[in-house]
Design a protein with these regions (language model features):
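Predominantly flavin-linked oxidoreductase catalytic cores and closely associated redox partners
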Residues: 1
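FAD-dependent oxidoreductase catalytic-site/capping-region signature
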Residues: 9-182
Length: 182
């Protein structure tokens, strides 16, 4: 869909198809495929969620489409161990808090990220289903095989993809972010 999405005439045709038939790319969500797997068989439950979008871009919703046709498989760690922070910097409610995402700050999250990228790579490049289309890996690139290098390359386009997770503790101890009076 890259060329259709990036072309004014292509967008016009997609809009017209929707207006006339209530069908076509305009009716699709951002992801056409979703799946859950374990990054390692020893895990009790799946910890990776995969999505596949019918467009190719570096960061979905942020950067323009590539100038070639492609798809974007993404992988999300749905059980991260890294912990971020949200800090209030002013008593003025109009001042945004300071948010530190702290992605990939634990060894486990880095290991899961590398495994997730390897699983996507294997699915896209080694399965008979996709091999017939002669796929090429654009990012991070097949030349990157070392786990830490995969994590580093992957961190260049890491985002929450709509799934920030976490809790805040109420109480009196050092782990509490608010007391009973908020």
């Amino acid at each position: 869909l890259n060329r259709k999405v990036e072309s004014l005439f292509g967008r016009f045709l997609m809009g017209l198809e929707y207006l006339l038939n209530q069908s076509g790319p305009v009716t699709m969500g951002a992801s056409q495929v979703c799946g859950f797997v374990k990054s390692d068989p020893s895990r009790a439950t799946p910890n990776l969620q995969f999505h596949v979008s019918p467009v190719s871009t570096d960061i979905l919703g942020v950067t323009p489409m590539h100038d070639f046709e492609g798809i974007t498989p993404t992988v999300a760690n749905i059980r991260p161990t890294s912990r971020g922070e949200i800090n209030i910097v002013s008593n003025d409610s109009r001042i945004y808090p300071k948010i530190k995402m702290n992605y990939l700050s634990t060894d486990d999250d880095r290991k899961v990220a590398a495994q997730g990228l390897k699983i996507v790579r294997k699915l896209m490049l080694e399965t008979e289903t996709f091999r017939q289309y002669e796929p090429e890996e654009y990012r991070p690139g097949v030349h990157i095989t070392d786990d830490e290098e995969l994590v580093k390359a992957g961190s260049d386009f890491t985002q929450t993809i709509f799934h920030p997770v976490g809790t805040c503790k109420m109480g009196q101890d050092n782990m509490a972010v608010v007391d009973e009076k908020l």
